[in-house]
């Protein structure tokens, strides 16, 4: 059985073949409505919303390494509004971590704090790597990992509930799980 996302991306017309090469990797414009990093049959779809960013780079790291082995700038053609999206082919999700660098205006009064030298964690990351010991202050940048969706939705239809009808409860996991009870 395929998960909902696996079925969506396998039926998606963009999940086909590369159109260009960036930093030695075959690429094509991505699937803009899949936030974060989503594994596809032949590659990985990377999508990030920058809210005012003027350029974006995808950084690929070997696991547990601080320096990227590849930097892939998103072409302007791979941007719609504030969303950058690119499919990168030939990646084994078990062998790398990723992060972004985003450039744009620096204007704290307007809440714009872009710095093209800062490495940013994907806000949609499904797994975060970097801190090896829990509770110890980490002085390095966190990286994201790509995770396969292993949940089997079967024939269950997607929820038709309106966002205004949902109740979302956020839980601070560490405090909730810290006590042995």
Task: List the predicted regions and their residue ranges.
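The feature marks proteins involved in alpha-glucan
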Residues: 2-41, 68-71, 78-86, 90-170, ...
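Structural beta-strand segments of beta-rich domains
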Residues: 42-46
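Short proline/glycine-enriched turn/loop motifs at strand-loop junctions of beta-rich domains
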Residues: 49-55
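Beta-strand signatures of extracellular beta-sandwich domains
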Residues: 57-59, 99
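Structured catalytic/translocation cores of nucleotide/phosphate-coupled proteins
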Residues: 30, 60-61
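Residue-level signature of catalytic and energy-coupling elements of molecular machines
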Residues: 48, 171
């Amino acid at each position: 059985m395929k998960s909902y996302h696996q079925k969506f991306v396998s039926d998606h017309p963009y999940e086909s073949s590369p159109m260009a090469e960036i930093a030695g990797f075959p690429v094509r414009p991505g699937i803009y409505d899949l936030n974060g990093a989503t594994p596809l049959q032949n590659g990985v779809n990377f999508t990030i919303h920058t809210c005012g960013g003027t350029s974006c780079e995808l950084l690929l790291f070997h696991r547990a390494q601080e320096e990227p082995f590849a930097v892939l700038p998103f072409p302007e053609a791979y941007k719609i509004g504030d969303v950058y999206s690119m499919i990168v082919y030939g990646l084994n999700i078990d062998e790398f971590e990723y992060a972004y660098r985003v450039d744009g205006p620096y204007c704290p009064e307007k809440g714009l704090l872009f710095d093209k030298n800062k490495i940013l964690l994907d806000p949609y990351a499904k797994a975060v790597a970097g801190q090896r010991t829990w509770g110890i202050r980490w002085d390095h940048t966190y990286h994201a990992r790509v995770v396969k969706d292993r949940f089997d939705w079967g024939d269950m239809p997607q929820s038709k509930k309106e966002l205004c009808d949902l109740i979302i409860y956020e839980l601070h996991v560490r405090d909730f799980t810290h006590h042995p009870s």
